[in-house]
A protein has these predicted regions:
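Conserved N-terminal phosphate-binding loop of PLP-dependent enzymes in the Aspartate aminotransferase
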Residues: 1-439
Length: 439
């Protein structure tokens, strides 16, 4: 009997033994086509020869050095690379997972306010229908009813405003611009009610990932939100743990929104899953307030700026740049959306297909005309996943798409290296899975 604690405590997962490109292989030799990079992680696929070579080279050089005493060329170079592409952020720190860097963002937001002599600026505002991590801090700002439910009593208080979810919430008599303005006014009002002297930061996923299924904001939304934050001296912190590092066709998803936040968190795709590594980038204003204040970052963890993880992430980023993969992500993304629309056009339960780059969501409804959220909930998501697995297809379904408990979606996040032929196979097989599962 296994000694491993699994997510599903009563069933064993499949034993994975290998992978190559967009394919994963189990112990019985069955191959699975990966439409979702696991959970938007494997952007370069499996067994990439350059990454394998980098492991051998770097592991022979230096495994680990404590960040309290040492820095490394890899950490310096990776930070410079990420900062230089950020459009205005100044410093980066590396941790192991998305929750950790989002928790760090919360701590730095408060440390910054406090060291400026504004310790009352301590309230965090986030959006409903969002996910920012599994620690108690990050879960408290996650507008994800399902993931919060067990731990509700333990969570510190946080405030929430509406998501930017045009498919469901933009009114028929409203333009995208008016919708964005209405949401910015809602945030403005929320801050006024709480008192801007009490609010530290506003958090948002640039493109909402697992909770809603690849939902980008309407054009102009983030510019208006940023203006509200600036007006009230509130930090704007973007969570791109899932959407960042090329997934939308830009290194940072906010490039499409025409803004630069005060902080951004990235994770999953940073080392394409070859290493557990994440990063938080912050502005010079925030860094210098702390540097000239206490001079000490109020957070310490064992694997800060892990040398080997940074070196592998750097090689991953180098491959993405040299192979011009972001352009490919944009092109394949358009193909994916248009092929999905074509192949699912006759299914009335497919309500919306949206996203950016290779970050695409399919939302299910009871009927296209009414947009009534699909009734299937968790059972439908599980059935889709099971059917797909049987057919050798890895998909990432979710439920609670609309208002936290209702509705279903599937998130596509295939590796950046996916060929046209492989993309076509993903769409074809997915269409067959949807048709095979009772609805
Ligand atoms: C947007 C977002 N933020 C934070 C996290 C947490 O990251 P991790 O699971 O690596 O801790 C996730 C994970 O799915 C995420 O999608």
């Amino acid at each position: 009997m296994s000694k491993v604690i699994y997510k599903n405590l009563n069933t064993s997962p499949i034993l994975a033994v290998g992978g190559s490109g967009v394919w994963l292989e189990d112990a019985a030799g069955k191959r699975y086509l990966d439409t979702c990079g696991g959970v938007a992680v494997s952007s370069l696929g499996h067994a990439h020869p350059r990454i394998a070579a980098a492991f051998e080279r770097e592991a022979k050089n230096l495994a680990w050095a404590h960040a309290g005493s040492f820095t490394t060329a890899a950490a310096e170079e990776l930070a410079t690379r990420l900062v230089d592409s950020s459009g205005g952020l100044a410093r980066a720190q590396f941790l192991s997972g998305g929750s950790e860097v989002m928790e760090l963002a919360m701590k730095i937001a408060y440390q910054y306010q406090s060291e400026r002599g504004l310790p009352d600026k301590s309230i965090f505002i986030s959006r409903r229908q969002s996910y920012h991590g599994s620690t108690l801090g990050t879960l408290s700002i996650s507008g994800n009813v399902q993931r919060q439910s067990v731990f509700g009593r333990l969570l510190p208080p946080a405030e929430f405003v509406s998501p930017c979810y045009a498919y469901r919430d933009q009114r028929a008599d409203e333009s995208e611009d008016q919708y964005g303005t209405r949401l910015a006014q809602e945030l403005d009002e929320k801050i006024r009610v709480l008192g801007s002297e009490n609010v530290a930061a506003f958090f948002a996923e640039t493109v909402v990932g697992s909770t809603n299924g690849a939902v980008p904001a309407v054009p102009g939304y983030f510019r208006k939100i940023k203006a509200v934050c600036e007006r009230h001296d509130v930090l704007l912190i973007l969570d791109e743990v899932m959407a960042g590092m090329g997934r939308t066709g830009h290194l940072y998803a906010y490039a499409d929104d025409g803004i630069v936040p005060d902080m951004v968190a990235v994770g999953k795709g940073l080392a394409a899953g070859y290493m557990p590594i994440s990063a938080l980038l912050i502005s010079e204003r925030i860094h210098s307030a702390m540097a000239q204040g206490s001079g000490v970052l109020g957070n310490g963890q064992t694997h800060v700026n892990h040398p080997l993880a940074c070196a592998i992430a750097l090689e991953v980023q180098q491959v993405i740049r040299e192979e011009n993969l972001l352009a490919q992500v944009r092109q394949r993304g358009e193909q994916l959306r248009s092929w999905l629309k074509e192949s699912l056009a006759d299914l009335d339960i497919v309500g919306d297909i949206r996203g950016r780059g290779l970050f695409v969501g399919v939302e299910f409804v009871e009927s296209r005309a009414t947009k009534e959220p699909f009734h299937g909930a968790g059972a439908y998501a599980a059935a889709l996943k099971q059917e797909a697995l049987q057919r050798g297809l890895l998909i990432y379904p979710g439920s609670g798409t609309a208002q936290g408990l209702l509705g279903n979606h599937v998130l596509f996040a295939p590796p950046f290296i996916t060929s046209e032929d492989e993309l076509g196979q993903m769409v074809e097989r997915f269409s067959a899975v949807v048709r095979a599962v009772a609805h």
